[in-house]
Amino acid sequence: MIFKGDSVRLQCHFKTFSGVSINPDNVELVIYDKAKNIIETIPITDENKTATGQYYYDYVVPDDIDEYFIFEYRGIHNTKPILAREKVNIKFN
C-alpha cells in the first residue's frame, strides 16, 4: 500500500507478442485518477530506462488523490501503440 504524499517507483517492461524486450518511440507515463481523468502526462527519456524495454519513474502521490490512481506507460512500436497499465491503491494512514 502506498501513502498519500509518498514517492512510489512506477515501472514497466515493454515486450513484443513473442516476448522480446523492445524500446518503443515516444514513451510517456500517464497518471489517471479513479474517475479515469488524466492528472498528469510525463515524457519518459533514456534517463528513465534501466534496460531494453524497462522503464521507471519516481512519482510523488498527490495529497488530493483518494483510494487509488492508475498509471499507464505508452509508446509507439512499428507504427502501432503499445501500453502497460496498472492500478495503485493508496491510503492516508
Where does each model-flagged region fall?
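Contiguous segments within soluble domain cores/interaction surfaces
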Residues: 1-93
